[in-house]
Amino acid sequence: MTSVQNTESETAAGATTIGVLFAGSDPETGPAACDLDEDGRFDVTQIRDFVAARDRVDDPDIDCVVAVHEPDGFDGVAFLEAVRQTHAEFPVVVVPTAVDEDVARRAVDADATGLVPAVSEDATAAIADRIEQSAPAHSEDTETRMPISDLTVESERRLKEQALDEAPIGITISDATDPEEPIIYINDSFEDITGYSPDEVVGANHRFLQGPKTNEDRVAEFWTAITEDHDTQVVLRNYRRDGSLFWNQVDISPIYDEDGTVSHYVGFQMDVSERMAAQQELQGERQSLDRLLDRVNGLMNDVTSALVRAADREEIETRITDRIGTGGEYAGAWFGRYDATEDTITVAEAAGDCEGCDGDVFDLASAGEAVALLQDVVEQREALVSTDADGVSGTADGDACVLVPVTYRSTTYGVLAVSTAEHRIDDREQVLLRSLGRTTGASINDALTRRTIATDTVLNIGVELSDTALFLVELAGATDTTFEQEATIADSQTQGVLMLVTTPHDDPQAVVDTALGYDAVQDAEVIVSTDDESVVQFDLSSSPLVDVLSECGSRVIRMHADRTTLELDVRVGTEGAARRVLSTLRDKYADVELVAYHEDDPEQTPHGFREELRNDLTDRQLTALQKAYVSGYFEWPRRAEGKQLAESMDIVPSTYHQHLQAAKQKLVGAFFEE
């Protein structure tokens, strides 16, 4: 932690100042903590450690936070999100060293007080204005009376001596009037750190701690400060009495007599060997990360550009496979499409060393090491590494292959296999490839959605599924009721599906208790209940029906279940998609009857508007908005309160209201947008 002192001597007693916590390191280009501190309106404290800075926010002298956001350093947006967990309205100005859409979106979602890019013109002035507008100032006293002055002179002297003797850091005092600057005092901690007793140290110069591995430049820096009579801090390697080395952080300050002449030097020694070891380990990790970034940075940019230019799913698969397989970073790549109904993965595209794998089919119901790995990738939705011994297509002798799930929310579109000549792939590289898989999955979903929105007509399909094994049908029969779907929410972080339904059952808790007996139900609860109906939430570990419909690029617009039948209204963009939905449902379920099939003009419906808004909302914002709507939160009087809805999402009320407010803002903005 660094306390930055005001340089303006004009700051007078009673002047109003704003306590500013500067979280993170100073940007290489842009405003630094000292720049703000030069403004007499602010009292700036800089803390570079994330946890320590978060704890400091709670202190009463902190009125505002300036959080630096660096892509490979201090995560200022994550710090803002951490502050918002307990301080919904605390002023936090985020200063990113580089701004992209994700940083801006996260900052807005977390309700940042301000977002000031470090490289922007007059960034310091902009930050200062934001602070002054949002943070209250407090009055500073020039001097605080210390009760120790109530003691007698002798008692005060003894107390201070005891404090020096028992301080947890090494303390020495040297005589500055003697050319040799001999030590005249050491405390107990100095002996603990160095192993030297007072008899061995008093009268000696500090040089006895130095040795062959002591950095001479640091020693010169140390003695320059002493010669020029100013404070200094130096970290250097010193030797203990037993000859062992340790890293010693030495702080030296001159003490002046009544005439203004330096009479003594006080030194503070701290063994920072563990900290230095951690820093060296971190430096090694950063160097390793730099090598990784050099390798994949161009790849990620090219892949992102390719995904943006791709017009449809087929082009997405081709572009991503060609770039990864032939770009030079990896030996080869292939893209396998996942068919949830057939439980197979079929290689659709291959490039580089994997060329020739096109058409290979993996039956996930069969045996084999490669199949087992692919099963785990699909089920766990995590990247896994295989070797040539596993028999994965395109893996040469000695090569390794990363199998990356291509997913969007609860839907798995396929598996991306990346082959490399390096037998071991860094965990962080796997994380980056996993992110690439999610990005590709989102692009495929967008392509399917765009096709539905952009088409001249949309097709509405009505089907009836007479299958008592369907969850809602079976539950309706077991509880003698009916269900009407209000919302189905797929979580992008898990395979789970959150389903909200209404039921006229007079005992909704009995419905919940019955549902909890099903293997697929992870949790269930009554959200709100009235005399006429109740809203019930089911948290499902998976939903084969939802997976099938998502894979086909369709959207459920109505779902009704009774004890024998599930009535389903689905919207798709093309006749081909409609045929695929029907074929997939008939392959999956025994009795599927088509009861409606007609075209709609998108200009006559709000479908496109809803789809674009749905894609603009985050998962949490969409969930908060849907729950508020179906639970009667917007009615008067309210049928459900925000606290109750927050508990159903396992978040605090303030966070729920932030998500809801952001969703409402996007909804209203989309409605009034020209």
Swiss-Prot record:
GO terms for biological process: phosphorelay signal transduction system. CDD domains: PAS. Residues 617-668 form the HTH bat-type domain. Gene3D superfamilies: 3.30.450.40, 3.40.50.2300, PAS domain (3.30.450.20). Keywords: Activator, Transcription, Transcription regulation. Disulfide bonds: none annotated. Residues 156-229 form the PAS domain. SUPFAM superfamilies: GAF domain-like, PYP-like sensor domain (PAS domain). Residues 19-131 form the Response regulatory domain. Residues 230-284 form the PAC domain. Residues 285-454 form the GAF domain. SMART domains: PAC. InterPro entries: BAT_GAF/HTH-assoc (IPR031803), GAF (IPR003018), GAF-like_dom_sf (IPR029016), HTH_bacterioopsin (IPR007050), PAC (IPR001610), PAS (IPR000014), PAS-assoc_C (IPR000700), PAS-like_dom_sf (IPR035965). PANTHER family: BACTERIOOPSIN TRANSCRIPTIONAL ACTIVATOR. NCBIfam families: sensory_box. Involved in activating bop (bacterioopsin) and brp gene expression at low-oxygen tension, which naturally occurs in stationary phase. This is Bacterioopsin transcriptional activator. It comes from Halobacterium salinarum (strain ATCC 700922 / JCM 11081 / NRC-1) (Halobacterium halobium). The lineage of its organism: Archaea, Methanobacteriati, Methanobacteriota, Stenosarchaea group, Halobacteria.
